[in-house]
Structure formats: C-alpha cells, structure tokens
C-alpha cells in the first residue's frame, strides 16, 4: 500500500530508472524512476544503484496493471531504512528457525506454511512469535496453540532470539569509599 516501506532487489538498471524485484510480494515488480533515486540531479544512475543490490523503498503508487509499483528511494530516511532492513533480517532469521523446527518435528510443507501464516497473524510477525516465546514461554499456549512442537519452538526461541528487554530482579549493594 502507498507509503509502505518495502525490501527490493535491483534486477535491471536503465537510463531512466531501475527495475526491482520485491522479496515480500511474489509476482509484483517495482520501478524506481531516476527522479526518485536521490535528492538532487543524478548524472549516472549506476553510481546509486546496481543489479543485485538490496534497497528499502517507499511505495509511491500502484500502477494500473496492479502488477507493478512505483517506488522511491530518496524519500526513505537513513534511520527508517536501517530499521526496516533490521526488521526484514529478523523475519528472514525467524523463517530459517521455523525451517529448522519443521524438520525437527516432521511437518509437511502444508503444515509448515499453515503454522508460519498462523504465527505471523497472531504475533504480527514471525519474529514476533519467536521473540514472545523467548520472553514469555507460556505465550503460545495462552492463546490456544498446542502440540509437540511448542517445547522445541520455545527452546529455539530462547537459544536464538535476544528480546528487546529483559527483567532482572535481585538485590544490589554499592559501597563507595572516599
């Protein structure tokens, strides 16, 4: 949707812009017009983008064919670019962990896909599901998940995911000698 930040990989660079593939959307391509590559005048587009490069772009509009998007590179701040890339990397990592789990517990492709979709819907992101399980192991069963995959899921989460915040309780004494 318009204004969304998406992950794109440059497929082809032309004089007037760059064609990109969208990792998260199968069958939809993007185009970054030369005027949306960078602020200011772009003399050589290849100095800014090259094939195979991963970019974070802002969706400007959906073209009439509904199969391609017009994107902007210049309207994404460095901070937002970094945050979105970190989010994408975390999600890729979570997919890898779920692959490990699927193999471990013997899920079929259909089960694997179904759990991936369900967990993503329940926790907004797949990474969010792992993060929540690492922080609060009972979070999965509390919202109705059950099965022999829960414990290995929690173990993978605890081993591989570092939560944003950790609560530490205890007594702390500090002596200062003058």
Task: List the predicted regions and their residue ranges.
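Single-stranded RNA-binding regions, centering on S1/OB-family and related RNA-binding modules
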Residues: 1-178
């Amino acid at each position: 949707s318009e204004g969304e930040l998406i992950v794109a990989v440059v497929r082809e660079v032309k004089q007037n812009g760059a064609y990109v593939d969208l990792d998260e959307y199968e069958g939809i391509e993007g185009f970054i017009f030369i005027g949306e590559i960078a602020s200011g005048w772009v003399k050589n587009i290849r100095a800014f983008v090259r094939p195979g490069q991963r970019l974070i772009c802002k969706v400007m509009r959906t073209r009439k064919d509904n199969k391609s998007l017009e994107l902007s590179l210049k309207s994404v701040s460095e901070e937002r670019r970094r945050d979105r890339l970190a989010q994408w990397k975390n999600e890729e990592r979570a997919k890898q962990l779920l692959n490990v789990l699927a193999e471990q517990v013997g899920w079929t492709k259909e089960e694997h896909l179904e759990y991936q979709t369900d967990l993503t819907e329940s926790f907004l992101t797949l990474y969010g599901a792992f993060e929540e399980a690492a922080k609060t192991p009972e979070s999965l069963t509390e919202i109705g998940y059950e099965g022999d995959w829960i414990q290995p899921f929690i173990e993978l989460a605890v081993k591989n995911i570092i939560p944003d915040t950790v609560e530490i309780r205890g007594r702390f004494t500090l002596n200062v000698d003058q």
